[in-house]
Amino acid sequence: MRINVLQHTPNEGPGAIRSWAEENGHELYVYHPYRYGILPDVEETDMLVILGGPMSPNDDFEWLKKERDLIRAAIKQDLPIFGACLGAQQISKALGGVVKNSGVKEVGFAPVFLKSHAIKGLPEEVSVLHWHQDCFEIPKGAELLFSSRLLKNQGFVMNHRIV
């Protein structure tokens, strides 16, 4: 399987995702659209991973818009997609959701709490690194997956293929 990763900062790479891919014999390719504006072709993608970053989906960068086009194309191809932080915001916005300033900043490690058992084996509570103030709408047809003490929408699952 070819896993294409969209990385949005030089310091926040695929980490455990890379290890999992290597252990399971998958090919992993990392793209830096913020730096070069280059994105993978959906035809050369078996799974799409969109990582976090300091920007907002509402920033006026052409590469952010093209990234959402890629997300929509991957959804149309029924590819598995995983988005973390900015990645989840980009998926929500690509599906017509609103991303806006939440009025609160979440910075540092804090727990998120499981709200759905749509994905088997997830813990009821897990400590994750937060570094954001934007919040996203849960897309139509998706199910709330995680919430934190400060923000209800911390993660969602859709059609068991988009997380």
What is the predicted role of each segment?
Residues 1-79:
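N-terminal beta1-alpha1 cap of cysteine-dependent amidohydrolase-like domains
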Residues 2-3, 78-80, 143, 161-163:
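Short active-site oxyanion
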Residues 7, 84, 129:
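Active-site-adjacent beta-strand anchor residues
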Residues 9, 91, 132-134:
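Compositionally biased, intrinsically disordered low-complexity segments enriched
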Residues 11-12, 89, 107, 151:
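Short alpha-helical
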Residues 15-16, 59-60, 92-94, 140, ...:
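Short glycine-/acidic-enriched loop or helix-start segments at secondary-structure transitions
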Residues 50-118:
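Cysteine-nucleophile active-site neighborhood
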Residues 95-163:
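Pocket-forming structural segment of enzyme catalytic cores
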